[in-house]
């Protein structure tokens, strides 16, 4: 709504005054959008009767003989304020009001304290004065006493202590209030005391409450005896008034009352200490402190500093020393984000903004700064953030420090708790991983290939595939890969360390007999019904990074066939390696001169060597005479089994090069022609023929 006629003001920027619509969206360079802007809904829904300057005048909060208190809204910030409207015509009729009307503004310009209301702006029109103050949303303390009948002692202690702190600040500044009463005590949103009305004692009842104190409300009911006697007085008159307020909080009544009302009778009752009875539920310390405040003799009455040091007043406030608040804002305490926003975005002169804030002079500039700063603090408090993440002002470092004043401690505590929680979670994950590894580790230790010879059955061996857990136990390598017995009770693992042998678990699958008629041929041996054909399945594993180390399907052509049972292997040196079956052997026969004979064949169509390539006349053929003589005569030859550990074995690079040689394969001979001759052997012992390994090592 437009401003009423005659209610214009020239303090604010021109764009706040001209036009029907106030600015809605302000710049967001220095402040968050929710702080610098005002929603249209807020302006539209605020009920008001008129506009004066940058303020919308709303509902009435209280009313007195010549003044009214109304709720207002600042259109530039969207913040609510309290506006005291004083009628000029009625005020001129009262000489005391006319004399001291400007005194309140001068006093509040000198005073700055958290328990004293801040005067923000003063407007004057043809018919009225407008005093703009911060709005105390907690209401009046008188209203709280009406609702509860009285206030509990612990809560009254808090209010009295805050009131004494505010009065002590006034006395240090040389200001005596002289009109301290329940009606002048307001509560903010945090339930803290706010002291109002300086120099306008006759306006004590502007909030319009009708209460039991109405017959004796005002200065006489709260005034000290020296004031009623019109004697010289000092700051201790405020100490007496504090005692009356304390009595009213604890009991809901006044300490001195007379019927009918008479100033002479009231004064006499004060001098005689004829106080109304106190409730029995009050503590002796509270009663003693109350009586000391209501001492009629000013010389015996404590001053404000002595009252502040009382034991009852400081109960539950140990370690909280008296904090002195400066009456002026220091330059380093300024909110630089708000100052820069006002100077660069709202059109205020930077030097004027600084001077007004430091001098605490009530005007529109101070009101804009105060309201924006309060809005910013509430935003940071609600968001629980130590700093503004978006639209941070980088021109001055002071604003960076001020954002951490409220939430630095809470942020550090929350961060330390998060770090501790993360550390506990990581430890739990590590423990779970260790337990998982411990559960998975026995799987490769108790595999079939590592079972001792005594546990291997004498029948045909059944093909077995490794499970997924076994394949992953060595990073993708099969647990059957190049593991051999080195000494009794130990085995060599792929990690080149000795692991103690454990007896297999009863549930560990054992090698079963293979019943595949297509992959095996029946062999007639004259060794009794207990001797049967035994097949040992060996997995081909080439240690190549380009080939996945997976368990291949075993075929009849890819196996060693060892004749004779049981099989006995002599222990080998730890430096020996079991080579992967690369070469193809056929047409092998027992070597003369060896009593213990064992024949084996290895069929692999994928081998690069063909059966014909291994001719008896070749130097690598097991039937070569030179080979036989060398084996039988020279035991130090690397081809000899007994001296194999003394010579270097074939490396994996040589094996791969031999495997990759391109040899034109020839047609294979029938299986019957490649079958070795069967020889009867002792059932209790079988060994390898050393000549069969010639050329392989």
Curated annotation (Swiss-Prot):
It catalyses: L-seryl-[protein] + ATP = O-phospho-L-seryl-[protein] + ADP + H(+); L-threonyl-[protein] + ATP = O-phospho-L-threonyl-[protein] + ADP + H(+). Residues 55-313 form the Protein kinase domain. The active site is at 179 (proton acceptor). InterPro entries: Kinase-like_dom_sf, Prot_kinase_dom, Protein_kinase_ATP_BS, Ser/Thr_kinase_AS. Residues 405-424, 460-473 have a biased composition (Basic and acidic residues). ATP binds at residues 61-69, 84. It holds the Pfam family Pkinase. Gene3D superfamilies: Transferase(Phosphotransferase) domain 1. SUPFAM superfamilies: Protein kinase-like (PK-like). Keywords: ATP-binding, Kinase, Nucleotide-binding, Serine/threonine-protein kinase, Transferase. Its EC number is 2.7.11.1. Residues 405-480, 586-642 are annotated as: Disordered. It comes from the Eukaryota. One of its GO terms (molecular function) is protein serine kinase activity. Residues 586-600, 627-637 have a biased composition (Polar residues). Residues 607-626 have a biased composition (Low complexity). Belongs to the protein kinase superfamily. CAMK Ser/Thr protein kinase family. SNF1 subfamily. This is Hormonally up-regulated neu tumor-associated kinase homolog. It comes from Xenopus tropicalis. The gene is hunk.
């Amino acid at each position: 709504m437009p401003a009423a006629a005659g209610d214009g003001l020239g303090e604010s920027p021109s764009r706040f005054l001209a036009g029907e619509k106030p600015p809605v969206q302000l710049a967001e360079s220095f402040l968050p959008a929710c702080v610098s802007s005002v929603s249209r809904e807020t302006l539209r829904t605020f009920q008001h009767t008129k506009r004066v300057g940058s303020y919308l005048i709303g509902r009435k909060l209280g009313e007195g003989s010549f003044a009214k208190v109304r709720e207002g809204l600042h259109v530039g910030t969207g913040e609510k304020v309290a506006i005291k409207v004083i009628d000029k015509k009625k005020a001129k009729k009262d000489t005391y009001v006319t004399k001291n009307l400007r005194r309140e503004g001068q006093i509040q310009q000198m005073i700055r304290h958290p328990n004293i209301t801040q005067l923000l702006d003063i407007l004057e029109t043809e018919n009225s004065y407008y005093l703009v103050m911060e709005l105390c949303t907690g209401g009046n303390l008188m209203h709280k006493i009406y609702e509860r009948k009285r206030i509990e002692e612990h809560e009254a202690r808090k209010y009295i202590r805050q009131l004494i702190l505010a009065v002590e600040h006034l006395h240090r500044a040389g200001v005596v209030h002289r009109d301290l009463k329940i009606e002048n005590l307001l509560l903010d949103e945090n339930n803290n005391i706010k002291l109002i009305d300086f120099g306008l004692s006759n306006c004590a009842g502007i909030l319009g409450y009708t209460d039991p104190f109405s017959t004796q409300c005002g200065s006489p009911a709260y005034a000290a005896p020296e004031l009623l006697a019109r004697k010289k007085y000092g700051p201790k008159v405020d100490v007496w008034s504090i005692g009356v307020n304390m009595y009213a909080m604890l009991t809901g009544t006044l300490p001195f009352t007379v019927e009918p009302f008479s100033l002479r009778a009231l004064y006499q009752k004060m001098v005689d200490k004829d106080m109304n009875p106190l409730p029995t539920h009050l503590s002796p310390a509270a009663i003693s402190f109350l009586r000391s405040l209501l001492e009629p003799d000013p010389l015996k009455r404590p001053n404000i500093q002595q009252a502040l040091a009382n034991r009852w007043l400081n109960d539950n406030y140990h370690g909280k020393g008296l904090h002195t608040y400066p009456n002026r804002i220091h330059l380093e305490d300024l909110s630089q984000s708000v100052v820069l926003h006002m100077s660069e975005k709202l059109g205020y002169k930077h030097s004027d903004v600084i001077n007004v804030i430091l001098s605490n002079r009530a005007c529109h500039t101070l009101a804009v700064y105060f309201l924006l700063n309060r809005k910013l603090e509430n935003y940071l408090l609600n968001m629980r953030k130590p700093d503004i993440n978006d639209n941070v002002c980088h021109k001055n470092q002071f604003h960076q420090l001020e954002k951490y004043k409220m939430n630095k401690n809470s942020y550090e505590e929350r961060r330390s708790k998060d770090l501790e929680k993360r550390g506990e979670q990581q430890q739990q994950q590590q423990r779970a991983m260790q337990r998982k590894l411990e559960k998975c580790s026995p799987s490769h230790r108790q595999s079939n290939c590592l079972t001792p010879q005594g546990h291997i059955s004498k029948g045909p061996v059944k093909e077995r595939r490794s499970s997924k857990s076994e394949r992953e136990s060595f990073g993708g390598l099969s647990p059957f890969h190049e593991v051999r017995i080195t000494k009794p009770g130990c085995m060599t693992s792929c990690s080149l360390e000795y692991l103690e042998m454990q007896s297999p678990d009863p549930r560990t699958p054992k090698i079963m007999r293979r019943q595949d008629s297509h992959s095996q041929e029946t062999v007639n041996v004259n060794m009794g019904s207990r001797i049967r054909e035994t097949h040992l399945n060996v997995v081909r594993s080439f240690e190549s990074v380009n080939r996945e180390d997976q368990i291949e399907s075993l075929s009849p052509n890819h196996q060693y066939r060892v004749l004779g049972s049981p099989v006995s292997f002599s222990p080998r040196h730890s430096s020996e390696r079991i080579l992967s079956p690369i070469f193809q052997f056929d047409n092998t026969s027992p070597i003369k001169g060896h009593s213990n004979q064992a024949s084996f064949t290895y069929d692999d169509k994928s081998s690069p060597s063909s059966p014909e390539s291994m001719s008896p006349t070749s130097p690598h053929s097991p039937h070569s005479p030179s080979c036989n003589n060398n084996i039988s005569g020279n035991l130090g030859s690397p081809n000899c089994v007994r001296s194999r550990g003394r010579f270097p074995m074939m490396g994996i690079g040589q094996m791969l090069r031999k495997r990759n040689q391109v040899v034109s394969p020839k047609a294979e001979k029938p299986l019957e022609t490649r079958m070795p001759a069967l020889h009867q052997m002792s059932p209790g012992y079988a060994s390898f023929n050393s000549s069969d390994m010639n050329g392989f090592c």
